[in-house]
UniProtKB/Swiss-Prot annotation:
Entry EC number(s): 3.6.1.54
Pathway(s) served: Glycolipid biosynthesis; lipid IV(A) biosynthesis; lipid IV(A) from (3R)-3-hydroxytetradecanoyl-[acyl-carrier-protein] and UDP-N-acetyl-alpha-D-glucosamine: step 4/6
UniProt similarity note: Belongs to the LpxH family.
Top-level taxon of origin: Bacteria
A Pfam cross-reference name: Metallophos
GO biological processes: lipid A biosynthetic process
UniProt keywords, alphabetically: Cell inner membrane, Cell membrane, Hydrolase, Lipid A biosynthesis, Lipid biosynthesis, Lipid metabolism, Manganese, Membrane, Metal-binding
UniProt keyword Cytoplasm, yes or no: no
The reaction(s) this protein catalyses: UDP-2-N,3-O-bis[(3R)-3-hydroxytetradecanoyl]-alpha-D-glucosamine + H2O = 2-N,3-O-bis[(3R)-3-hydroxytetradecanoyl]-alpha-D-glucosaminyl 1-phosphate + UMP + 2 H(+)
Taxonomic lineage of the native organism: Bacteria, Pseudomonadati, Pseudomonadota, Gammaproteobacteria, Oceanospirillales
Compartment(s) of residence: Cell inner membrane
Binding site for Mn(2+) 1: D8, H10, D41, H197
Protein's UniProt name: UDP-2,3-diacylglucosamine hydrolase
Length: 244
């Protein structure tokens, strides 16, 4: 049975077609998998496990159903949903992974990340990321009333979008030196991440041999997801209409 990797769904109530695409994926692709890894930005925004919107509840129910059928589900934080907690992970029947997460993938030393920590050329973003990932900041934010958290999240998203419009594309992509450093630090042959919305397979010739970096796609009318088994890793294109 294969292992599947997806990221950057950015689920939100305003995009029902996207939710339907994901549910069709769960019904028609994921049941054949040993495990499903969701590598961040699963939701467009997350302000706490206590929000329990109809979308969040239905997504949890669908994932839990898949987990009960035998597929192991793993969640990793992204830059939009880093406040997902153990409560919601349990509701989904999923395991919440720390980032980065190392694993032996059918004999291949591998590392899973969301990918934003690789974008070190964007110094302003990395500074903000350090603040948002600080446990003290998160605890203080989560202690506020839900409506205040929702308002703050909307305001911060507007600010982020405005800032990103003025950034060069190269700044928002991964830094090559950071990628090489990650391979060397963890001694891996395969790096899998999302975040950049630039699905591709990148190969590097390092002293230890050829290594690969797989970038997963975001979701819209189509996506690019990862499929691994004993025969290797594939980055596969999937159109929503193909599983409607």
């Amino acid at each position: 049975m294969p292992t599947l990797f997806i990221s950057d769904l950015h689920l939100e109530i305003e995009k029902p077609d996207l939710t339907r695409f994901f549910f069709n994926f769960l019904d028609k692709v994921a049941p054949n998998a040993e495990a499903l890894y969701i590598l961040g930005d699963f939701f467009e925004v997350w302000v706490g496990d206590d929000e329990q919107s109809p979308l969040q509840v239905e997504v949890a129910q669908r994932l839990h159903k898949l987990a009960e059928a035998g597929t192991h589900i793993h969640l990793m934080h992204g830059n939009r949903d880093f406040l997902i907690g153990e409560t919601y992970a349990k509701q989904c029947g999923a395991t919440l992974l720390a980032e980065p997460h190392a694993l032996d993938l059918y004999g291949v030393p591998s590392l899973l990340m969301h990918g934003d920590s690789l974008c070190t050329l964007d110094a302003a973003y990395q500074k903000a990321r350090a603040t948002f990932r600080n446990p003290a900041f998160q605890s203080q934010f989560l202690s506020r009333p839900l409506d205040q958290r929702q308002l703050t999240a909307r305001q911060m998203r507007q600010i982020s979008m405005a800032k990103n419009q003025g950034k060069a594309e190269v700044i928002m992509d991964v830094a090559p030196d950071e990628v090489i450093n990650t391979f060397n630090t963890y001694g891996i042959e395969l790096l899998i991440h999302g975040h950049t919305h630039r699905p591709d397979t990148h190969r590097y010739n390092l002293p230890q041999g050829e290594v690969k970096r797989i970038v997963l796609g975001d979701w819209g009318e189509e996506t690019w997801y990862g499929r691994a088994d004993a025969d290797g890793f594939q980055l596969l294109n999937l159109k929503a209409e193909d599983i409607a």
